[in-house]
Amino acid sequence: MNFTKLFVVFAVVLVAFAGQSEAGWRKRVFKPVEKFGQRVRDAGVQGIAIAQQGANVLATARGGPPQQG
């Protein structure tokens, strides 16, 4: 019985402190990772656009219609 009460009190205290904690270390660790992911995404989108333009130029040079994308 005492163990159950102790466990409940410990769980409540743990939730109270965990819920109010600041995300300082997580922010320091994951912010650069998030920025890196955004740069990779943006570079991929830009690379696809450049490849599509190159395909359009090639198709125009060959005399066909440009590719739709």
Swiss-Prot record:
One of its GO terms (cellular component) is extracellular region. The keyword Secreted applies. This is Cecropin-like peptide 1. The keyword Nuclease does not apply. Keywords: Amidation, Antibiotic, Antimicrobial, Immunity, Innate immunity, Secreted, Signal. Its main location: secreted. It is found in: Secreted. PANTHER family: CECROPIN-A1-RELATED. Induction: By bacterial infection. Antimicrobial peptide active against Gram-negative bacteria E.coli KCCM 11234 (MIC<=1.03 uM), E.aerogenes KCCM 12177 (MIC<=2.07 uM) and P.aeruginosa KCCM 11328 (MIC<=2.07 uM). Not active against various Gram-positive bacteria at concentrations up to 4.14 uM.
